[in-house]
Amino acid sequence: MALETFVNSEPFTFGVELEIQVVNTHNYDLTKAASDLMRLIQGETFPGNITPEITESMIELSTGICHSHEQAVSELHAIRDVLVKAADQLNVGLAGGGTHAFQQWSDRQIYDAPRFQYISELYGYLAKQFTVFGQHVHIGCPDPDSALFLLHSMSRFIPHFIALSASSPFVQNVDTGFHSARLNSVFAFPLSGRAPFVLTWDSFEEYFTKMVNTGVVNSMKDFYWDIRPKPGYGTIEVRVMDTPLSVDRAAAIACYIQTLARYLLTDRPLKLSEDDYLVYTFNRFEACRFGLEGTCVNPQTGERRTIAEDILDTLDRIAPHAAALGSRAALDEIGALAKARVNDASWLRTVFKQEKSLNETVRQQCLRWRE
């Protein structure tokens, strides 16, 4: 199969996708209700889209093409409200969070759609274990070479996105010690990790053709990279974030990525090199394990600092671009998180410490989702 033509899009526009937990309101375990939710929202009017995901206990919402923080917040609230209304009719709950705190993966049911059935047949039990919940952000790019430049420039900031969004400390009744345990599930897939270091679309097309000829992939959907190009949309897609506990947090993180993209493509402050990836996996692990307190190593200088410190320094550098995009409020929220060194994983642990019950913790997650 040939690679799609890259459709040039308006630079620095963005879209947000959120995978949401569907739980019962008895003990707040995951429940099979995605098909019923999809039936109930038919005929409803809302921006963006709502689609099923790989298991019946997940649903995905996505905005349209956004230009500003204000627009993203408005669209996310509108879509969220439609879903909450449908969930109330079914007496089920909806929650953010990168993992469900105590669900058993073997109980999951694959959603009845050809691609999901194919993934289940190909990956076996990993498909059911993939009942994890992420935020994806698309950034518009003016041309394919700019998309690849932005992809590799943005890779240095992957620890920021992981630490800020981290909301998956619990897995199957256990505190994993991680801030984002969700990404451990993603890493099990053979085509996960980082994209190959190529900087021209011609070279990327050659790589894609070679991969197709091996029989390993059929389309870009088969790559589970942390950031991947989406030629049909004219975007790059940042895929490392846990789904936050609120749509407002999701919008703030998306606008941080948007502002960073404008800085990286407009100012071009980085000289890209394969050596940028020498510490990529280490930095990624630190963000997953320790969140904002994790260590971030600069691949060029060897300088070590906390991820929180690196975020605060980055916010200073991109401030003029935040002003141009109207995203100062979003970046103020990001700065407050970095200064306090807290994220949604911190909040979940605090609730569990107080309540001594993961069932109650998930119930409170459902309340957060409505805020």
Curated annotation (Swiss-Prot):
Keywords: ATP-binding, Ligase, Nucleotide-binding. InterPro entries: GCL_type2/YbdK_subfam, GCS2, Gln_synth/guanido_kin_cat_dom, YbdK. It catalyses: L-cysteine + L-glutamate + ATP = gamma-L-glutamyl-L-cysteine + ADP + phosphate + H(+). Its EC number is 6.3.2.2. It holds the Pfam family GCS2. GO terms for biological process: modified amino acid biosynthetic process. It is an enzyme of class 6 (ligase). Gene3D superfamilies: 3.30.590.20. One of its GO terms (molecular function) is ATP binding. SUPFAM superfamilies: Glutamine synthetase/guanido kinase. The keyword ATP-binding applies. Signal peptide: none annotated. ATP-dependent carboxylate-amine ligase which exhibits weak glutamate--cysteine ligase activity. Belongs to the glutamate--cysteine ligase type 2 family. YbdK subfamily. PANTHER family: GLUTAMATE--CYSTEINE LIGASE 2-RELATED. This is Putative glutamate--cysteine ligase 2. It comes from Burkholderia cenocepacia (strain HI2424).
